[in-house]
Amino acid sequence: PILPGELRVYNLPRRDADGTVLAPLAYRVQSSIPITAYQFNPLDNEDVFSNDASLLIPSNVLGKYYFVMTREQTFDDLRSFVTVVAVRDDTTVNVDVSAPTLVGTNVRTGETIEHMEPGDSRSFHLMEYDVLNIETDEIGSDMSGTMILANRNVAVFGGSEASNAPNTNHCDKQLKVCEWDGETPCESNSDCTSKFNTCCADHLEQQLFPVKTWGQHYLASKAFPRNLEKDVYRIIAAENNTVVTTLPPQASIPVLNQGEWVDFESIENFEIHATRPIMVGQFLAAQDAPGPNIDGAQEGDAGIGDPAFILLVPNEQFRSDYVFLAPNRYELDYVTVVVPDGTKVW
């Protein structure tokens, strides 16, 4: 048994969902009383150069309606993804994609999962503990804004095998030059990737919040400052005509419609207000941020650490107590706590 406030680590065998695939790959975690659970991929960064972690949402809080948040694909073979997990038999999942997707296989039926283009919609039949993983198919593709609708509650994860933050590798399609310097010739983002993206990419993952849990008021707190790097924030709207403001002002944010999103960078702490429900993601910057990756690290760059994915919690869902794990094989560990003035924290 686990005592109140105690923390226990369980190492699970690998059950990779690699590429676009539908297969029975999920693990089930069940307890006799309510618990808090997290997953680390992997826990201590052993035998890999990249990892991330996610809070796991209990099945009674899952939903049927989601929008995906992740980062764009920045390498040929390291892709963005959305993962859907069924918790009941005969779950129908409809996916409206926002990016070109990789061809894959439905292991249950042996059928091919065909390539999709932005705006395409496809339905999938999942049984209990089936995993549907859909990945992007080209550099610059981003699954953010993909809509998930299901007839039963599902768990949805968004992430990337390895993505950058910030992105400094885009090709200006009109001028045919790389954005970061306005001079290097390009035809596509792939012409600006290897040399000009801010080092280094990292694995990203988060279990996403169903739309029914989104809020309209958030507090954004800069992650532990390593140097002059800025965090990247992404805001996605659930409804049309969503007006977003920040206090103090951080960026010019357009009116967002359903499934639309906006990115901006900030080194400050600030409030986010919206007229309709939004989801807010925070991405830690790479070790060579804030400068483009020209000659490696420059003065003022973070110098350590790479992108990680955090989902902000709306103010109305703040809690008074938390249990969390900091793995013991990292050079730096820190926790960020946001509280009202005069609050005691221990």
Predicted regions and their residues:
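Conserved functional hotspot residues at active sites or interaction interfaces
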Residues: P1-G145, L149-D172, F196-W346
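Extracellular/cell-surface secretome signature
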Residues: C171-N197
